[in-house]
């Protein structure tokens, strides 16, 4: 059975046992997380969501928090200025192993829902604003 999930603004086609590199999630290595934004579930029959499949989920285990490959941005300005600048960037990523694809029954699984770091910051900000 496979599923198409959405996280970090991207879509991934996964099945049990797959290892994924996704945008950084607010969790620690060894945590079990669940993705509820499932766009499609397939197997014997295919179910396409509008926009999400109700009750479907993908459960995964966090292997590690890693950094992506370094990208280097080099800027050289035009004549008579002799100015150069080099900037590097390494994207923060989360390494996951998919443990299970659930076509239904995701609400009763008891596994924590995966949230990105931006979602976690937004929730903390909203909680402090209410106090």
Curated annotation (Swiss-Prot):
PANTHER family in UniProt: 50S RIBOSOMAL PROTEIN L21 (PTHR21349), LARGE RIBOSOMAL SUBUNIT PROTEIN BL21M (PTHR21349:SF0)
Keyword Ribonucleoprotein: yes
Molecular function per GO: rRNA binding; structural constituent of ribosome
Name recorded for this polypeptide: Large ribosomal subunit protein bL21
Family the UniProt entry places it in: Belongs to the bacterial ribosomal protein bL21 family.
Source organism (scientific name): Cereibacter sphaeroides (strain ATCC 17023 / DSM 158 / JCM 6121 / CCUG 31486 / LMG 2827 / NBRC 12203 / NCIMB 8253 / ATH 2.4.1.) (Rhodobacter sphaeroides)
CC per GO annotation: cytoplasm; ribonucleoprotein complex; ribosome
InterPro entries named in the record: bL21-like, bL21-like_sf, Ribosomal_bL21
Gene name of this polypeptide: rplU
Gene Ontology process terms (BP): translation
Keywords: Ribonucleoprotein, Ribosomal protein, RNA-binding, rRNA-binding
Function of the molecule: This protein binds to 23S rRNA in the presence of protein L20.
Known partners and oligomeric status: Part of the 50S ribosomal subunit. Contacts protein L20.
Source species, domain of life: Bacteria
HAMAP family: Ribosomal_bL21 (MF_01363)
